[in-house]
Amino acid sequence: MIKIIITDDQDIVREGLASLLQLREELDVIATARNGQEAFEKAKELEPDIVLMDIRMPVSNGVEGTKLITSSLPSVKVLMLTTFKDSALIAEALEEGASGYLLKDMSADTIVKAVMTVHSGGMVLPPELTAQMLNEWKREKQLKGINEIEKPNELLDLTEREIEVLAELGYGLNNKEIAEKLYITEGTVKNHVSNIISKLAVRDRTQAAIYSVRYGVSVF
């Protein structure tokens, strides 16, 4: 059973989502929280598998909460709850180690599937939101007088197969899914991911996925 903490400053959202998810026998909502700091404190105490985290909250927002959790509790995954207006904050949360994000108005089935994906080691990156984030990154560059996002030299150090694996990381796939798609073993995927993280000098697979999206390896 997957243990979950739900974090949102709005009572109706927090309790409503908790009630919906508690109906699923594979999920156990062990606590709720009103802000990022409270989520962190409860995560330390209760050791959940996943924290569902709203982005915009008073006292301590979702980015701050994500940073606290991922830096101190590496076994706990964070999945962001957001709206289309929060793409800048989503990017910050991903850079702090969140395993993906969902729109708040998505169906319970979609949220459950996302939780299962994150729990199995994958990421959740809805294409429509990811494309919007990418467009904002491009727009930021254009405002600075740069027409295209230049690809870093580190990408040249990757093998063709590592580039393929990196692209799939950007689409949110876990090792098993990548192995099936590329017709290689999970162990081989794991080795490729380790090499990618080392060569790109990123912290983890989440950072590698962001890198892949930002520099156009994963195309949306």
UniProtKB/Swiss-Prot annotation:
InterPro entries: CheY-like_superfamily (IPR011006), Sig_transdc_resp-reg_C-effctor (IPR016032), Sig_transdc_resp-reg_receiver (IPR001789), Tscrpt_reg_LuxR_C (IPR000792), WalR-like (IPR039420). Keywords: Activator, Cytoplasm, DNA-binding, Phosphoprotein, Transcription, Transcription regulation, Two-component regulatory system. Disruption phenotype: Deletion mutant does not show any observable phenotype. GO terms for molecular function: DNA binding. GO terms for biological process: phosphorelay signal transduction system; regulation of DNA-templated transcription. Pfam families: GerE (PF00196), Response_reg (PF00072). GO terms for cellular component: cytoplasm. It is found in: Cytoplasm. The modification 4-aspartylphosphate is found at D54. Required for resistance to linearmycins, a family of antibiotic-specialized metabolites produced by some streptomycetes. Member of the two-component regulatory system LnrJ/LnrK, which induces expression of the LnrLMN ABC transporter in response to linearmycins and other polyenes. Probably binds to the promoter region of the lnrLMN operon and directly regulates its expression. May also promote biofilm formation. This is Transcriptional regulatory protein LnrK. It comes from Bacillus subtilis (strain 168).
